[in-house]
Amino acid sequence: MGSRGVHFVGSFPGTSTEDAMRAMLDAAGPRLRTLPTGETRRYEFYIQPIIEDLVAQGALEVKKLGTWRSSRERTIHRVPSGRELTGDMMDLGYLGEAEEALAVFRDLRAARELPELTLQIGMPTDFTLAFIAMGIPGVRSHRKAFRDATVRDITAIHELVGTDVVVQLEATAEMVLMAKTQPLHRRLEAALRLGEGIAALAESAPAGTKFGVHLCVGSMRNKSRVRMRDLRPFVELANSVVRQWPSDRPLTFVHAPLAAGDIPPSADPGFYAPLADLALDTGTNFYAGFVHDSPTVAEQVETLGLIENALGRPVDGVASACGLGRRPRPIADALAARAEALAAT
């Protein structure tokens, strides 16, 4: 059982990129397959700083001002009058994040003697970014622009780093919509072609680009948008993604949200039962996002047993349900250490 890895979703409350990356390595270095940057420019607010940058760039303007106390109360944007939104108008910041982190990553990897470690760059899907920035009308009218801007950065990062990077696609809006419409989530997935859209984003990137997929239910201010009744919506969406995934863009992992913000993972075996139907391809790891600060370690060990019994095998890695950037630093450090301890059980 010691072969389980540890996965960090991305954000971490570090004072700098180096501080965040060192903290994650200190907690679980030998168990890490990928090392995120910590997303220290945006760790607390996730997509909000990206959208605010787009306003500053003149690509978007405020349509309806919100408080951002929750994603439901977010600010909604539109394209300025007389302009047509294109990918060339938008700098999403991912390339700059990779450029800043690359030297730090290479130095830390060499110092820790972890030659197999890969840099991880997280980015929301085009659907999620358009949905959060502009609502459903934005998805309908402007998704291509967000896709083009995202693919431009993926291409540039691939050229910069080569095979030493995994791009983590973060499908928050897709997963929240699936969970909210349960038990009608299959109809929603078919109507909006959510899995197809995630796979199509990968297919638009250069051949050989390595990916992971983080299916997320949100954690703004450590509050989730939704709590699943069981894991059926996750399994259905993950299987849809895998079925349509391009064969020449390796899908290295799928990460599942098994907790929900401040709500700990379920103690009901039935919640995890749909994992028996999860159909990942060979070479795609399953990362269980259940590490949480509310239960005791002993309770979390029991939860891990429920997950693995439902899955029918050991998980490939353990993780929190979302990034640790919305948590105070002492809690983030404790959760990182807990992940390592649970992986070792």
At which residue positions do the language-model features occur?
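N-terminal basic, low-complexity leaders that serve as flexible interaction/assembly modules and, when applicable
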Residues: 1-71, 107, 344
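Acidic (Asp/Glu)-rich catalytic clusters
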Residues: 25-26, 69, 104-118, 158-162, ...
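Acidic, His- and aromatic-enriched active-site or binding-groove loops in soluble protein domains
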Residues: 59, 63, 140-153, 184-205, ...
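Active-site-proximal, glycine-rich beta->alpha crossover segments in alpha/beta enzymes
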Residues: 69-162, 166-193
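Active-site-proximal loop/turn and secondary-structure-junction residues that shape catalytic pockets
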Residues: 125-129, 171-175, 217-221, 258-262, ...
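Conserved, mostly hydrophobic/aromatic
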Residues: 150-151, 213, 254, 318
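Aromatic-lined glycan-binding groove of carbohydrate-active enzymes
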Residues: 194-283
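Catalytic-face loop-and-helix region of soluble metabolic enzyme cores
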Residues: 243-345
